[in-house]
Amino acid sequence: MFSDKDLAEIKNHELTVDQINDQIAQIKSGMAFSKLKEAATVGNGILKLKEHEETYFINLFDQRSPELSMVKFVPASGAATRMFKFLFEFLNNYDLTQGSINSYIEKSNNKELTKFLEAIEKLPFFEEVVHKTHKVIPNFNDLSFEEERVEFVKTMLDEARLNYSFYPKGLLPFHKYKARVSTAFEEHFFEAAYYASSLNVANLHFTISEIHNKNFNEELNYIQEDIEAETNKTFNTSFSYQKKSTDTIALTLNDELYKDTDGSILFRPSGHGALLENLNDLDYDIIFIKNIDNVVVKEHHQNISNYKKMLAGILLDVQDKTFKFLNQLIFFNLYFISKTTF
């Protein structure tokens, strides 16, 4: 079934033939859907703490944190391509000669485009895009409304302009403050300073795409000194790539291996579940996990920190009780053995 070339490619991806056959069988049979029993509610899957309990768990974490090793684990390999899918559709399908953008939206039902245009001036990258567009098109202000919006989107996505869709979401302008704009990547450092640090040292680990390694390191070198000065923390930052051994194959409609035009097997990165491999490589007492674009502006960092500390405090409390029970079991087992032996 597999050619010598196929076998070499499979081996190069750190996979085995058995694993590929398992993938093929799974694709053919399909994935079983989970049957949901009911929605989680407070008291039934959702824990609601009283105010004094919140304080207890936060204090427990604060007291124990100096003796713990901690890291913030951030999946950050996602590219912005999917985020801008509706804008690519707009550029590909909208014809300036056929009517207004509003008429296009009505025909295409592109609701995301409506929201985008209504809030366009509030976007964190608005000024950057306008500035770049003026450089590319000197008479930008003389264009019609429709032409302006088309050129604005082109500047965002065109490879010869800002090429936002190439970059990972973590490195795009993300939050807009009065005097500056920050990326999601940068915000994670400020947030980590509140709860994922011990003895004024914070560890962060980002999983990234290999093609963006240079971009992330450049951004890190640009922001680290200022962030450390502002937070009075030292940051240890590491990166890893999603492992090739977690890639998956695809099948044609005839259930044959899908191959590129050069005859090589098409391997595609798996979802976030594949990052369990990267997570398992880390050795820390506590690992805080947060996706790259799940980060808030600075004014909410303290509130977010309290919830993270509560969760970690609950973890420590459960761990303490578990260890206590295990030690009691060990003691009683030893006691029982000594009684039956002598």
Named regions from a protein language model:
Residues 7-27:
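Conserved catalytic alpha/beta core of Sir2/sirtuin-type deacylases, generalized to analogous enzyme cores
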